[in-house]
């Protein structure tokens, strides 16, 4: 059974994409778009112009995290394209893998920026923490992965027996 855990934003209703509902939903660290600096067009509401749905292409390509639990492998993919390998640390703390990235203030095309993040992921019980590896792709995606231990217990059917007494005291059989 493969399990993919995506960014929680994807599971939000469509209407909630139209405007940030909380301060944490706002897009910090992103530059303003030209449309946000100009007066609103009468045909388009300023509410819609500032909505994340109009910013989706640039927004969805930065900072995404995906955890996958496949039949034979556990993996985490994290967009860290704004960090060099020297600015990243991956470590195991008990049953968690922690990824930390930090770079000091530096100038970019929009001014000065400093970034820092810290992510923790629970290591599945069937993964040996000593087998965890990490790699950074050319396009800035950090992959942390490990093989899953294969179960030695073979699959078997378990028969169902019928009891003559109710599971809940006082319940009557209908």
Curated annotation (Swiss-Prot):
Which GO molecular function annotation, any one, does this entry have? protein homodimerization activity
Region Disordered, as annotated, extends over 148-174
List of residues that carry N-acetylmethionine: 1
Q: Which UniProt keywords apply?
A: Acetylation, Eye lens protein, Metal-binding, Zinc
Please list the residues that bind Zn(2+) 2. 103, 105
Domain (sHSP) spans 55-163
This protein's source sits in the domain of life called: Eukaryota
Q: Which residues bind Zn(2+) 1?
A: 82, 110
* One term under GO cellular component: nucleus
Renumbered to this chain, the Basic and acidic residues biased-composition regions fall at 149-166
Q: Which GO terms describe its biological process?
A: negative regulation of apoptotic process; protein refolding; response to heat
- In which tissues does this protein get expressed? Lens as well as other tissues.
**Quaternary structure?**
Heteromer composed of three CRYAA and one CRYAB subunits. Aggregates with homologous proteins, including the small heat shock protein HSPB1, to form large heteromeric complexes. Inter-subunit bridging via zinc ions enhances stability, which is crucial as there is no protein turn over in the lens.
The entry assigns this protein to a family as follows: Belongs to the small heat shock protein (HSP20) family.
What role does it play? May contribute to the transparency and refractive index of the lens.
Stated name of the protein? Alpha-crystallin B chain
Organism of this sequence: Anas platyrhynchos
- Gene name, Swiss-Prot/TrEMBL: CRYAB
